[in-house]
Amino acid sequence: MQIDLSQIYSGVDQLYANQPQMPSYAPGRSIVTSVYSAELATGYVLMCELARLGNKLPVEVFYRDGELSQQQIDLLTSPDPSKITVKKIRGNAKDFTTIYGTKAGWSVKVHAIYESSYDEILWLDSDSFPITNPEFLFNDPEYVSKGSLFWRDVTSVDRSNRYYDQAPLWQVFRVQPNDGEPFEAGQLLINKSKCWMQFSLVKHYADNCEYYYHFGGDTETFRMAWQHHEARRNGYYSYINYHASNLVPYGFIPYGPFHKGVPNQYGKWGGGTVMVQRDRVGCELFNHRNINKFKLSGNVYNNDITNEWHYHQHVKQLNTLLEVNKW
């Protein structure tokens, strides 16, 4: 589509001029995710794993109107009813129409974070399963000092045309070309009060996703929001070495992901079907099963994946509940 840069620049300038007010978030922390009907099995596995790993934080699960039934909501809360709350999104989390004509609900993530109850959140895609209890991430030194923590993505040659110096990405987001690694937003931490303007910009991008989601969906909007905000503060032509400088405006895990599991059908992105994200010392921390998502049946068993047995037991338990309750 043709994009009028002056129009979208004006929208961002107006956002900064108005300085959107932050809602009254409760002090504290929560884990936030979203689920819809087709991903019930995946969401149930995540809820079971958080309970099994000893998570003590509130868990907020969001959905759009009509995307979960009451029975499915009850199933999602059942692994830990005292901590898990399922909430309907109140705002207009729009679909983005991809170049293939399919609808993508990527803006749900942003609206879920915006509508979550607590000031500090750990977002998890419903298919990003922690390998150990992830609560310790809120004490990460970079997160504490910068109010955010992100993970890097895998890349392949077919994505290189997004990042050359004259690529539309930099023009649309009004960011100077730089060597910052692309984000993988299956998991992220944000202190909303500390990074309110940056997150407000992410939400602006979501609410105008027809312009901003052409570069991989919601994922790049987090990196671009933090970089754009920093450019406004220090000048659009200021330079940051995103691999070495302590001026990088966001917390960032130094290790990239790798893939395990059965081979993926595309033959790229590391070859496997499970993206393994690491912690600050390089240990495996998240199994992001974003290719072969869990279903009620026909799931592939990956012998090399930590906690794989537990995942399949959770799906078996879900099927038992569905059968017993005739859901």
PLM regions: where:
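A glycosyltransferase accessory/donor-loop signature
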Residues: 1-35, 39, 177-327
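Hydrophobic targeting segments
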Residues: 29-33, 50, 59-61
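Histidine-anchored nucleotide/phosphate-binding helix
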Residues: 33, 37-54
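Short, charged/polar "capping" segments at the starts of alpha-helices
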Residues: 40-41, 66-73, 158-159
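Short internal beta-strands
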Residues: 58-67, 150
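Active-site-proximal specificity loops/subdomain of glycosyltransferases
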Residues: 71-116
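Conserved catalytic core of nucleotide-sugar-dependent glycosyltransferases
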Residues: 96-98, 140-200
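GT-A fold catalytic core of metal-dependent nucleotide-sugar glycosyltransferases
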Residues: 105-163, 188-189
